[in-house]
Each structure stands twice: as structure tokens, then as C-alpha cells.
Amino acid sequence: PDLLATAELLHCAGRVASLVFEPCAGFEALRQDALAPQQAYADYLRGQINLQSIPLLPQAQRAAAAGDANALKEIADPLSQLVAAGVLLQTGKASPAVIGQAIDTASSQGWRRPLLAWLGVQLKRAEQGGDLQEAVRLRRRMALTQGRALPMNQPRHELLSDTQKESP
């Protein structure tokens, strides 16, 4: 059960890195027989770690689990970086710098799914902040990432979502 629990947690960590926040059902079925560090990590992935359990987490995740968004820069492993960024986002502690770093990390690794998810977060923030030029740029980047390039001369209003279209 120990190896199976670890495998389930790795699967769930990958989903958190891609901003898929859902229960880790595979692990939850094994929780009662799992080791304390595995249980702590599962709680962390849900954004529900308690302070007493932080020392049980992998070293790379401890500072981020304590809410230190600056710790992301110190995490060497790209997947661990994205997991920490995902947890920070899930708990409402992801700054624009965290989002930017997550985008850079996913992009540099060539990981399309996490990149699209993080670009989507940045797009939503740009739209909410009324930065239409940034929203257009992000939509173009997302289209390129998905393998469908948008023409550079496409009218701006066609790149905006229906709710964000400029008024005449």
C-alpha cells in the first residue's frame, strides 16, 4: 500500500501542477493505511495542511506550505515548483510573481497542459483588471500553445471574449 499511495500522490501532484483541484480519490481509498508523511502531503495538495504537519512534507514544499510565496524560486525541481505554485493559488496566496514563475517553468519544460492552465489564470486576472491589451496577448499565446496560431492582423475585438469586447 505504501508504493501505491505514493503513486497516487504523484498522480494528484501532477494534477495540482496543472491546476486541476479535485479530491485525490485514489489516495483517499488508501489513506487509512498510508504513512503520516503521505497523509500530510495529500492534505497539502488539497490546500488543507496544518502547521504541525509541515515538517512531514518533502523539503522542497515546506516553505511554500507555510505560505512563503518567495520560496518558489528556491525549488530546483520544475514539477515541485508547479505543485507549490498550484497549492499557493489554491489557498489564495499566489502573487502575480508566482503565476509568472509558474508560466516560465511550464514553458521552459515544454509542458503544455500546465502552461495553458497558468496562462488561463493570468488571462483571467488581466480581464478582471481591465487590461485588454494583455488579455489579447495572452489569448494569442494560448492559441500558439494549443497549436493554432491567430493571425497577427486579426482585429482586436475578435480576440476578446464576448464579455470583454470593446464598445463602439
Residue ranges and their predicted role:
Residues 35-111:
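Extended amphipathic alpha-helical interaction segments
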Residues 14, 18, 91-93, 109, ...:
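Structural motif corresponding to the intra-repeat A-B loop/turn of tetratricopeptide repeats
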Residues 122-168:
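A cross-kingdom marker for long, charged
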Residues 6, 11-13, 83-86, 102, ...:
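Structural register within alpha-helical repeat arrays
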Residues 1, 27-35, 68-76, 103-113, ...:
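Solenoid-like repeat scaffolds
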Residues 23-26, 98-105, 118, 138:
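Alpha-helical solenoid repeat scaffolds, predominantly canonical TPR units
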